[in-house]
């Protein structure tokens, strides 16, 4: 079943939340940056997989969160080959097939999905939405929660579980010299 949601996808209690990524290990802007801050352990797994060249377009990288409550997985969905490039509809189409297979394998009942490749990726939301509708309708036993394009939340309300680096007097002195 496909439903539409609004709000911050990072707060969704679906079994899995989709994170749109590239294949080179950079989460520097947009939704990926929000995921990097909210789920730092996911970033470590993703970065290591990219360094090993095992993240490729068309294939999902599910990362278990080892949580007792949903979400249980972050599923990294490569929508771009490189962070400097644009997304391609073929990456979305191939990725949706892989996502359906992962949903079956992981026995997911619900998945929260952002506007794949439609923000910084540059794809038309209408074209992406059509692919999502057509592909995911084939697996109606999963609740697919679609988050259409919307403005980014303010920095003050974004989840941030990253640790602040310790600023010692010595480090401050060195920075003061620069």
Where are these regions (language model features)?
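Macrodomain-like recognition of ADP-ribose-binding/processing modules
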Residues: 1-178
